[in-house]
Regions:
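Catalytic alpha/beta core domains of metabolic enzymes, predominantly
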Residues: 1-81
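C-terminal helical cap(s) of enzyme catalytic domains, especially alpha/beta-barrels
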Residues: 84-117
Length: 121
């Protein structure tokens, strides 16, 4: 078999079109010994709503989920960025502007660095 595997948490559909991320899955996935990524942009999408629909995501949860994944010391992060998110042709409701992405990524890496320093102390 292929040993070059990357696991990705993207949320699981429960209830009313919500994709739910259980942070415990980060630890479970890491236990398999493969790199783990978090698809933050997908995890806030509203399941079953077209990606062009502005009601198709819950962007207000993106910062919290991104920071949780940084604290979990994952190997990578997916986010979707667009110069004009509301006019993006796909996943408009979950896109970050360049400015939003820059601010959140800066915070993300500060948390990730702190967590790694704690692990190594």
């Amino acid at each position: 078999g292929n040993s070059s595997i990357i696991l990705t948490e993207r949320g699981t559909c429960f209830g009313y079109r919500d994709l739910v991320v259980d942070p415990r899955s980060f630890t479970v996935m890491k236990s398999f010994g493969h790199p783990v990524l978090f698809d933050a942009g997908h995890s806030i999408r509203k399941y079953g709503i077209p990606s062009s629909d502005p009601n198709g995501g819950t962007k207000q949860f993106l910062p919290t989920l991104m920071m949780a994944s940084a604290a979990a010391d994952l190997n990578g992060l997916f986010i979707e960025v667009h110069p004009d998110p509301k006019n993006a042709l796909c996943d408009a409701a979950s896109q970050l502007s360049f400015d939003e992405a820059g601010r959140l990524i800066t915070k993300y890496f500060k948390i990730a660095k702190f967590v790694r320093e704690l692990k190594n102390s």
